[in-house]
Amino acid sequence: RSEKAIRRADICLLVIDIAAGITQQDRRIAGIIAEEGKPCIIIVNKFDLFHPNASRKDRMAEVEEQVRRELFFISYAPFIATSAKKAEGVEIIFKVITRIRRESHNLPTTGQLNRLIQLAQQMNPPGAASGSARRLKIYYATTAVDPKYNTIPVPRYVLFVNDKSLLTDSYSQYLRNKIREAYPAPGIPVIFSARSRVRND
């Protein structure tokens, strides 16, 4: 049931009972959100019960560290600390949803994406593949928006490369970070796919 709801959703709100800690069910749902490439907000509820005698700043820092460590696969998702019982932080959820909708329309064009990718390669060229002298070459990139995302466009960045098997997870993450630095879009995943293409030049 949760899988179907996630697939239908424009934005997924992952609610965590921080008093109980991050559970296996939370991780499972977060994994589905990541697999589906869905925009997401992490809502940390019952924040008032989390180390109530500590300062809010220290509590926020500890919660964020825990959330980012255990739910690293949805690191793009902003998190909001709330207390439903005290009605604290609830209004922020709607503000963040509005921001995600707005920022989703401020993503790089194909031309901007290619300039960014080329600059990223110049700054940090791909290393040789393990056990091989071959190196990844990214010829160009395109941006495609999946038609199933009607309200909030989620771009799919397609990289045309010499050999897609040379695109490592670490280099993909490097490119994601560069895109996020240039075009911050909290809550929106950065999704890559690679296609091998032979060039004669």
PLM region descriptions:
Residues 4-14, 19-201:
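C-terminal-of-GTPase-core extension/linker across diverse P-loop GTPases
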